[in-house]
Amino acid sequence: MGGQMQQNNAAAATALYDGALPTNDAGDAVMARWLQSAGLQHLASPVASTGNDQRHLPNLLMQGYGAQTAEEKQRLFQLMRNLNFNGESTSESYTPTAHTSAAMPSSEGFFSPEFRGDFGAGLLDLHAMDDTELLSEHVITEPFEPSPFMPSVNKEFEEDYNLAANRQQRQQTEAEPLGLLPKSDKENNSVAKIKVVVRKRPLNKKETAKKEEDVVTVSDNSLTVHEPRVKVDLTAYVEKHEFCFDAVLDEDVSNDEVYRATIEPIIPIIFQRTKATCFAYGQTGSGKTFTMKPLPIRAVEDLMRLLRQPVYSNQRFKLWLSYFEIYGGKLFDLLSERKKLCMREDGRQQVCIVGLQEYEVSDVQIVKDFIEKGNAERSTGSTGANEESSRSHAILQLVVKKHVEVKDTRRRNNDSNELPGKVVGKISFIDLAGSERGADTTDNDRQTRIEGAEINKSLLALKECIRALDNDQLHIPFRGSKLTEVLRDSFVGNSRTVMISCISPNAGSCEHTLNTLRYADRVKSLSKSGNSKKDQTANSMPPVNKDPLLGPNDVEDVFEPPQEVNVPETRRRVVEKDSNSSTSGIDFRQPTNYREESGIPSFSMDKGRSEPNSSFAGSTSQRNNISSYPQETSDREEKVKKVSPPRGKGLREEKPDRPQNWSKRDVSSSDIPTLTNFRQNASETASRQYETASRQYETDPSLDENLDALLEEEEALIAAHRKEIEDTMEIVREEMKLLAEVDQPGSMIENYVTQLSFVLSRKAAGLVSLQARLARFQHRLKEQEILSRKRVPR
């Protein structure tokens, strides 16, 4: 039946689109047959309202067919959809004239309120695109198909939808000849938010001369590290470590292939408000600078090629370049003779680098000159692992800006911080300083070790930011270091990150290589799992009120943090709540009276020790009270034991069994004293811990006061030393002046001797004062050291 109806619908739709209906009477006949195919022959025929052209039927309002029930609306809607689909295949030869276009209703009146927002269901909005694009592959579809009977949407929203549809259609049509731009949002999303690539460098001359072996083997997107190890009995063996990443590049891969695997997929989406970051990580001497050097130049070539396209040149898109470094937690502009920069946040919490000079670039050769100039200014040094090691993080930023119509003279007069133009996209290339282990820096001086500590700190902060970014966390810890603060806008919003891990293949650098690969693996670990930390936390939580008999009060008791000092109190609280919740006619004070009479110790937080109220005398009446516990109490306490968390498990598992046993049998006099002794021991242990904690709390404030006083005295000593240096410089200037005067002919030697004596006395007094302050501080240091040694055992 359904197949026959569809065939009738198709035949009727074909007849409607034949254009062979000369009169309105013939059109009414075909229309009646079309409606009859869906069992809607009783509805009014709207052909008369459309003139002689039946191609306007898909755009008619449903009210034009007369009054309808909900079921009839649905059938009519399906009928109109079939009409539209059949009309699509034969609409090539139809081109609307100016008269017919003017006669059509506006785009807002095409559909009834039941159809608004349902363009993805097959009803094409002819005013949202050109008639020549009806058969184009760029048909705007909705991600879901809403119900045809949804309530009418807002008119403003409908207009915004049409504007967005027109804009997206124009952009896709214009971007077709570019070839580099993505064709759909699906392809944009195909570019991974974070991509980890590993590059293996070849053995260098020094390693070849030492006849070191290559311990890294590459296979597709995975690699294996063959680590040479030695057992306890000095037997040599090889341990294999396998890693898998997005891409693994061996020593034969050129820089051009590295660019195609890392940066090239990101370049087109830079023009879609994307902020990308590419950085190289690895031990010092693993080839980071060699890898990063050609990447910005290739990226500029592709960016300039796109900027020359009419799509962007007509919008006044321009490319800007800046180059700076982070050395020792400070920022320096590499293109302005290492001018010191400041990092600030504006009112919108956007990071601004005050004083950073940006340069508009329009040629690749200009970019090469800027990069060479910046590399010459970059901080380098010699370490135990590399003779010429990068000791700073160099950041090269390429920013695409959309400029407004401004005179060139005005733009030149503006400061570099206030350049006109809105940021469209940005890509940052970061050549990180080499990571190093503390064991390799023993032969370095103090300054080199401080540099290494700052470098490792910033690298760890960068790793945490990338993991938070890949995990879609709400908070990204970009304040961990200056490096991540500067790159804050690259870690939020629409961002992409590419990490190139450079490794050394020789056996001597095996530990460094493993550390680098583990770092990269941690960065990529959350990408593999695809689970956020929130989901993991939700899955790991135990079921809370799963049993319907377990009330909310019981749940609160279960998840209350266990405290050793409240062991008896917790027992009493559970018993009281269970007895109060029971509906049987039992004396509600019975458990409390039993507890007080039976001698179970009540614990006092103020005194910090247990005091048994009375000696235990097990009488028959007490045993009857014990045996009269309701069975509901034991059942509930058994449920409490099942839901209780693992912490405090020993004490909590011991308690619920006892009431259950008491309810089944009489309690002997030997059982209850054992329970009493156990609780007394527990309370005594808790009291001792409480008193120890109290003593520690009493002594901690004095320790803090001593440390604060010592720090204040240290600052005073340093300030006094600085003042003494300034005074000494002033005295030296006075002495130079005296020497110049005494060299003059006719000078008075008596004046020279008197003034020199006064100057030397001042110098000696200052030195004596500084020495006295230094001696006092040394004495305080020794006292503090002795006190700290005494506190260690406790």
Swiss-Prot record:
Biased composition (Polar residues): 580-593, 611-632, 669-696
GO cellular component terms, semicolon-separated: Golgi stack; microtubule; secondary cell wall
Phenotype upon loss of function: No obvious growth phenotype, but leaf trichomes with 4 branches instead of 3 and decreased size and number of Golgi-associated vesicles in root-cap peripheral cells. Smaller pits in the secondary cell walls of root metaxylem vessels. Enlarged petals and overbranched trichomes.
PROSITE patterns recorded: KINESIN_MOTOR_1, KINESIN_MOTOR_2
Residue ranges of domain Kinesin motor in the record: 193-526
Spans annotated as Disordered: 525-699
Superkingdom of this protein's organism: Eukaryota
Principal localisation: Golgi
Effect of residue 334 to F: In kin13a-3: Enhanced petals and leaves size and overbranched trichomes
GO molecular function: ATP binding; microtubule binding; microtubule motor activity
Location(s), subcellular: Golgi apparatus, Golgi stack; Cytoplasm, Cytoskeleton
Keyword annotations: ATP-binding, Coiled coil, Cytoplasm, Cytoskeleton, Golgi apparatus, Microtubule, Motor protein, Nucleotide-binding
Any single biological process term in GO: microtubule-based movement
One Pfam family of this chain: Kinesin
Tissues in which the UniProt entry reports expression: Expressed in leaves, roots, young and mature seedlings. Preferentially expressed in the secondary cell wall pits of differentiating metaxylem vessel cells (at the protein level).
Binding site for ATP: 282-289
Coiled coil: 705-742
Family: Belongs to the TRAFAC class myosin-kinesin ATPase superfamily. Kinesin family. KIN-13 subfamily.
Subunit-level organization: Component of the active ARAC10-IRC5-KIN13A complex. Interacts (via-C-terminus) with ICR2 and ICR5 (via N-terminus). No interactions with ICR1.
Its job: Internal motor kinesin involved in trichome morphogenesis. Participates in regulating the formation of Golgi-associated vesicles. Plays a central role in microtubule disassembly via the active ARAC10-ICR5 cascade, which establishes the secondary cell wall pattern in metaxylem vessel cells. Acts redundantly with KIN13B to modulate cell wall synthesis and cell expansion via the THE1 pathway.
Protein name: Kinesin-like protein KIN-13A
Gene name linked to the record: KIN13A
